[in-house]
Amino acid sequence: DPERGFVNYFWKAVPVTAGADAEDGLRLDDRVAIVTGAGAGLGRAYALELARRGAKVVVNDLGGTRDGSGKGSKSPADQVVAEIKKMGAEAVANYDNVATDTGGENIVQTAIDTFGRVDILINNAGILRDKSFLKMTPQDWQAVLDVHLNGAYFVTRPAMAAMKENGYGRIVMTT
């Protein structure tokens, strides 16, 4: 929509009250959503919007640096959970690594243990290797594949099994 513009459409402020009527009327009450890489950026925006629409949210973020290196910090996921709770919605933090099968299973298990089910999965976790293709080493390339590709698989597989049991599920892959 040219009148609203790209930035206004995608970056409009999230209301500070959960359950506020969405412009399009889409409600997600009683749905449970997992968002990977939700400690900042688009993942944070997805988590906040899902909560605003009534979903219970698992906020997954390893807490590492943008390039995937560095020691993990629980604070990004915890900060988003605090924002969601301040809205009056429900959320729980998860700090597991999407790039391992155990991490993927633990993320989904967090949703099941906390909220009893999984209905929505947004695979958003990613790392940034700020290098041109010719300057990227095989190790850099593998790190990107481990998080972006394998991470999506490791979380989707157990989430899809849970969704099949529920008879409902939606999966979004971001790139």
Each language-model region and where it sits:
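Canonical Rossmann dinucleotide-binding motif of NAD(H)/NADP(H)-dependent dehydrogenases/reductases
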Residues: D29-V58
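Conserved glycine-rich Rossmann-like NAD(P)H-binding loop of the short-chain dehydrogenase/reductase
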Residues: A55-Q79
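Substrate-binding pocket helix/loop in short-chain dehydrogenase/reductase
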Residues: I84, S132-F133, D140-Q142
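A hydrophobic alpha-helix adjacent to the NAD(P)-binding/active-site core of NAD(P)-dependent oxidoreductases
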Residues: L128, M136, V144
